[in-house]
């Protein structure tokens, strides 16, 4: 008897979760489809952006130079500069040390000097083959 009740509750939970997802995707439009562009549309939007300086490829933001391009998700990413003048965006470290990386003006300067913490210092060491 208890097994049957548990089975029924489990089945109802799974069915209701799937139904909720279906309804949410159908009636809220699942915004992701509206944001998708074909390669031609993307190229056309970038070519007609009106940017007279440098258009960042990841964010379509107009900046003075490529080194000023922001990461696509600045609240959760660090922009780390490479020795060749380019940059790479990586996820900010999590856990207890995450507060050290809250300020985007200084977070790229921090090096925890710990290969278990992936920050810009780690990227520099990896570039040199030290990791």
Curated annotation (Swiss-Prot):
Keyword Signal: yes
Keywords annotated in UniProt: Signal
Signal sequence range: 1-17
Alphabetized InterPro entries for the sequence: LCL2
GO annotation terms (biological process): ERAD pathway
UniProt-listed PANTHER family: LONG CHRONOLOGICAL LIFESPAN PROTEIN 2
Family assignment from sequence similarity: Belongs to the LCL2 family.
Function: Probable component of the endoplasmic reticulum-associated degradation (ERAD) pathway.
Record's protein name: Long chronological lifespan protein 2
Organism: Debaryomyces hansenii (strain ATCC 36239 / CBS 767 / BCRC 21394 / JCM 1990 / NBRC 0083 / IGC 2968)
């Amino acid at each position: 008897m208890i097994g049957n009740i548990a089975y029924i509750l489990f089945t109802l939970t799974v069915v209701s979760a799937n139904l909720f997802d279906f309804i949410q995707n159908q009636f809220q439009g699942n915004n992701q489809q509206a944001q998708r562009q074909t390669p031609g549309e993307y190229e056309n939007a970038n070519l007609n952006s009106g940017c007279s300086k440098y258009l960042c490829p990841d964010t379509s933001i107009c900046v003075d130079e490529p080194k000023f391009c922001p990461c696509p998700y600045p609240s959760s990413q660090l922009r780390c500069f490479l020795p060749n003048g380019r940059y790479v965006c990586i996820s900010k470290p999590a856990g207890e040390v995450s507060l050290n990386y809250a300020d985007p003006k200084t977070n790229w300067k921090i090096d925890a000097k710990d290969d278990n913490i992936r920050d810009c210092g780690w990227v520099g060491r990896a570039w040199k083959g030290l990791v």
